[in-house]
A protein has these predicted regions:
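Solvent-exposed, low-complexity, repeat-rich "mucin-like" stalks and linkers
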Residues: 15-43
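Extracellular/luminal low-complexity segments enriched in Ser/Thr/Pro
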Residues: 60-69
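Surface-exposed or secretory-pathway low-complexity segments enriched in glycine-proline
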Residues: 39-60, 87
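Proline/serine/threonine-rich low-complexity linkers at boundaries of modular beta-sandwich domains
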Residues: 4-16
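C-terminal beta-strand-rich structural cap/linker in extracellular carbohydrate-active enzymes
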Residues: 451-479
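Aromatic-lined carbohydrate-binding/catalytic grooves of carbohydrate-active enzymes
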Residues: 122-250
């Protein structure tokens, strides 16, 4: 039985609320697309004032081209029968400005594995909208490995296999919903995630292995096809690349980044799976997110390994560049055909660590089996707002105790978010002294706890709590 109380998500009930970060980034002179996330009763009307020439709002979807670099404030107004909401958003237009806050979206790997099909991707995109998940800011639908066939086509690039008959039609369908589309590749000669009907699938290099790099999956080829593949992804209409190899070196990362920058489309760029901290200066400047951890596999000991990976990178997170704790390992995964081994409390902890530790959040479960708990797990606007907060503060531990860790994150409104992780196997009691009397809110439950200068919390094993305080904690102890 679940211990942690969480509020029930009701994306299409009540007055409207805009769930968009206070800062949005985009490149000049490249196509821009954004679905304005709005919860509340339907129908709704949306208006925007302050948009430049070339960018328009159609329903909830902003699209067009920003012709000049710079900053501008756009006021968004939404109304329904229950009320009205207005929010001013800062648009920062320039090279490298995309995704100032962590990416929110869906990725196919845990949900479908290498069996993924074009139909799976397009149906998932529609389901994200129908369920209301997109109204909390999830804006990317990313296809992981399993789409690849052989080299060919107009650009001599990797072509899709028969499971993906029309990549352009797929991205068009995703874009029509106001969402962005992602793709997967690797600099290795052979990609991970090969579908069972193939013996291997190619990456972005060919030829003999380059002796400068390790021989993982055949190594990295001497002949580089990054430009070919980026040209093909551009023609298809993709907006995001997951680039996956081990060890994740900056030479190959930069070769791909440079080609993405030349594209007529703007690409978010994620590198995995062994982006070592010794290269943090590069990751923190040139990639939107980077991983150096195990794949999230949906059981407790694996979750702890992913969690522990954060501590080597926690001081390097910065605006636009975030350490990635991998896709969510929650819900039902079709590739395993069963629900994962995590309890509901452990799933809450898994989500909390991504949200509060400034990681991208990518859902990766089979949405046709989504239940009320899972929807509420993914769709807590107050938890997501902490992840998307534009103070861009680090989330750092103020207590590493016996089976319990407490993290602090300063927020843009001057309040503080605290995440408590009980990772041990025993119940833990904590007492925190605040700098003054404060309003304390249980963020998962969406309930105010008290006006207090002392916060006492009891945490059951394998649980997480998130509180938001109007005053800072000056000390916290484990009893």
């Amino acid at each position: 039985m679940r211990v942690t109380k969480i509020a029930t998500a009701k994306p299409f009930v009540g007055a409207p609320k805009i769930n968009l970060a206070a800062i949005v980034g985009a490149a000049p002179n490249k196509p821009f697309l954004l679905r304005i996330p709005v919860t509340g009763e339907r129908p709704i009307t949306c208006r925007a004032s302050g948009l430049p020439k070339g960018v328009t709002l159609d329903g909830q979807i902003l699209s067009g081209v920003f012709s000049e670099a710079g900053e501008l404030d756009v006021t968004l107004t939404v109304e329904n029968a229950k009320g009205r909401c207005e929010r001013t958003v800062r648009f920062e237009i320039g090279e490298g400005k995309l995704l100032p806050t962590p990416l929110l979206g869906f990725t196919t790997w845990n949900a479908f594995g290498s069996d993924v099909t074009q139909k799976d991707v397009t149906q998932t995109a529609k389901r994200l909208v129908e369920l209301g998940i997109t109204e909390y800011g999830y804006g990317y639908v990313n296809t992981d490995s399993g789409w690849q066939g052989v080299y060919g086509g107009a650009h001599d690039a990797v072509m899709p296999n028969a499971k993906f008959p029309d990549m352009k039609a797929m991205t068009d369908a995703i874009h029509a919903l106001g969402l962005r589309a992602g793709i997967y590749s690797t600099p290795m000669l052979t990609a991970w995630g090969c579908p069972k009907e193939f013996s291997s699938i190619p990456g972005c290099t060919v030829g003999e292995p380059d002796p400068r790099f390790t021989d993982t999956n055949g190594g990295i080829g001497m002949i580089h096809k990054e430009a070919n593949n980026v040209a093909q992804w551009t023609d298809w209409g993709f907006d995001y690349l997951k680039y996956d190899w081990r060890p994740t070196d900056t030479v190959n990362a930069e070769l791909m980044r440079a080609e993405l920058a030349k594209s007529s489309r703007e690409f978010a760029y994620c590198v995995t799976v062994d982006a070592l901290p010794q290269y943090h200066a590069y990751w923190s400047r040139f990639v939107n997110s980077y991983r150096c951890n195990w794949d999230a596999l949906g059981y407790w000991s694996n979750l702890l390994l992913v969690y522990e990976s954060y501590f080597r990178f926690m001081e390097y997170n910065c605006k636009g560049h975030f350490f990635d704790l991998d896709m969510l390992d929650t819900g039902t995964c079709r590739c395993a055909a069963v629900k994962n081994e995590l309890t509901e409390d452990e799933m809450i902890l898994a989500y909390t660590m991504r949200a509060l530790l400034n990681s991208p959040i990518q859902i990766s479960s089979s949405l046709e089996k989504l239940d009320d708990f899972e929807l509420s797990l993914y769709c807590n606007d107050e938890i997501i707002a902490i992840n998307q907060d534009t103070a861009f503060s680090l989330s750092l531990p103020i207590l590493r105790g016996r089976g319990v860790d407490v993290f602090e994150k300063r927020l843009a409104d001057g309040s503080y978010a605290y995440a408590y992780f009980c990772i041990g196997d025993e119940t833990v009691e904590t007492v925190a002294e605040l700098e003054g009397t404060a309003t304390v809110r249980d963020v998962w439950a969406k309930e105010d706890l008290a006006e207090t200068a002392t916060l006492s919390l009891t945490l059951a094993p394998h649980t997480a709590r998130v509180v938001r305080c109007t005053s800072r904690i000056k000390s916290v102890i484990q009893k």
